[in-house]
């Protein structure tokens, strides 16, 4: 009974101690929470103390670049398609059986190269027949001329009448006309025989064959035997906004050929370089664009017919232009501006007038000068007159590349 009484007292004491500990814990937490607003209020009431606190904090890190003076090319860009300078469907001009093909698919051929042969048997027979008829009529003409000569001698002594002489003269003339017709028939038969050998009409690359050896073909077949595309040179047709026409015309009047570059679909690799050939003679009223044609030598076969490319045409070069990274140019309510760093790394906002720009750099025509440092990263943390810390951009080079660079630097120092 006595042990049970002691146990209850022990439990009561433990509970009391726990309650006291909990009370002190919550009391301390409330005191700390009430102290924070007071500190904030004190800071707000003491501007000088706030500025001292800011100075004690870390400076905003930014990245910067120096405005440089350089020549900047001006490009006009558009989307275009590569087209063959000439595309020819090779068809047979005579009817007959296809006996042979003398090309490999994809082969480069020259004008006049033999491509295919049609069975020439019927054309040889027709030629021989025409030649035989010509020979026969020539013999007839020779005999008629001899008779005419005799008639002319006899007419002098009145042994033949004038009517007989005229009739013989007409026979000679008629036979001469027949000879001309025979000669035309021989030429036609010879031409048919020549056409049985089908040759390339232009230089270019042959495509896939459209018919196999042994088939009967005719001059009316629309598919033809093969298609030749001329790829040396090759053309690029692209479009420009109508607002660019005056710029192109003015550049053409300068007398120098305008350089056109062909870039791949992703605009990351230059495929080839050519020159402007011509502008179309009218604007597309639906799209407000004009077609432009450029020509490329394409000796390396980098361009292929119907290939989609991005076109860039150089129309002008701006000399002594002030250039900064595009990332430094900002837009606000007052217009375009940049943050400029002074010698103490304090920033100030400068309104600028931008010019030519791309994804990497922009020309500044007014507002800053070459040599000025502009902020390119960390701009969202800036205020007028704030002092910042200029840090270098994080390098993506590997340790091995860095070691190689250091080794080259050492070699350069030794040399």
Swiss-Prot record:
The gene is mdtA. Part of a tripartite efflux system composed of MdtA, MdtB and MdtC. This is Multidrug resistance protein MdtA. GO terms for molecular function: efflux transmembrane transporter activity. Its main location: membrane. Induction: The mdtABC operon is transcriptionally activated by BaeR. It is found in: Cell inner membrane. Residues 1-21 form the signal peptide. InterPro entries: CusB_D23, Multidrug-R_MdtA, RND_pump_MFP. Residues 31-46 have a biased composition (Polar residues). It comes from Escherichia coli O45:K1 (strain S88 / ExPEC). The MdtABC tripartite complex confers resistance against novobiocin and deoxycholate.
